[in-house]
């Protein structure tokens, strides 16, 4: 555990049962945690950072993550957290049950415009699993790989630990791959 992570966890413990909040900044000397005061009117359910604290963090270094906690809550970002994360365009680190969960900023899962290798089918389920706490590696995808006897989705998902199940055994959280206009999913 890094010194930054230790400082984040200590701040969350001190603030509980209220949500803690702060920033991770990067400076030439390294990464640091800047704790902030939660100015929310309901600090046990929400967090709010004063604009002055945000400016203070920006003046001390490059903000690389926004941090807050869910004391007694769940280890993933709420719907409101996700909306605010997208507006901030920052990774968010969430303290929950003594652990730090790191969420990169991903666009909303619905309403995306398809762009091969950027917001394609693999990116969609990679982002969905990331939001649920499971990391999947990204991989390079050449255009038209499906026309060159490659099956990148199935091959790369197997490396990540996914495996094929009969449709009759499918359950929530499984991925369904379909072929539309191609011979491979």
Kindly label every feature range from the protein language model.
Residues 1-65, 71-104:
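Conserved beta-strand-loop surface patch within small alpha/beta domains used
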Residues 10-14, 109-116, 164:
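Short helix-to-loop capping/linker segments positioned immediately adjacent to catalytic or ligand/cofactor-binding
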Residues 16-18, 109, 119-123, 171:
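Short gly/pro-enriched beta-turn/loop segments at secondary-structure junctions
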Residues 67-69, 178-179:
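Short His-Asn-centered micro-motif
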Residues 107-119, 177-185:
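Glycine-rich catalytic cores of cysteine/serine-nucleophile enzymes that process amide/ester linkages
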Residues 115-132:
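Active-site nucleophilic cysteine motif
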Residues 134-146:
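Short acidic alpha-helical/loop segments enriched in Asp/Glu that coordinate divalent cations
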Residues 144-185:
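...with weaker cross-activation on analogous glycine-rich loops/strands in unrelated enzymes
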């Amino acid at each position: 555990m890094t010194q930054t992570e230790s400082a984040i966890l200590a701040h969350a413990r001190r603030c509980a049962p209220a949500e803690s909040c702060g920033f991770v900044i990067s400076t030439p000397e390294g990464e640091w945690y800047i704790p902030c005061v939660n100015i929310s009117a309901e600090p046990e359910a929400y967090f709010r950072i004063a604009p002055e604290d945000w400016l203070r963090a920006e003046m001390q270094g490059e903000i690389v993550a926004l941090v807050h906690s869910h004391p007694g809550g769940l280890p993933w970002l709420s719907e409101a957290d996700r909306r605010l994360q997208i507006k901030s365009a920052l990774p968010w680190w969430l303290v929950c049950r003594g652990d730090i969960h790191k969420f990169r900023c991903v666009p909303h899962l619905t309403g995306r415009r398809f762009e091969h290798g950027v917001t394609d089918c693999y990116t969609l389920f990679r982002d969905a699993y990331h939001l649920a706490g499971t990391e999947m590696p990204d991989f390079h995808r050449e255009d038209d790989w499906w026309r060159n006897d490659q099956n990148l989705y199935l091959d790369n998902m197997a490396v990540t630990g996914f495996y094929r199940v009969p449709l009759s055994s499918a359950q929530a959280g499984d991925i369904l791959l379909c072929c539309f206009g191609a011979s491979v999913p």
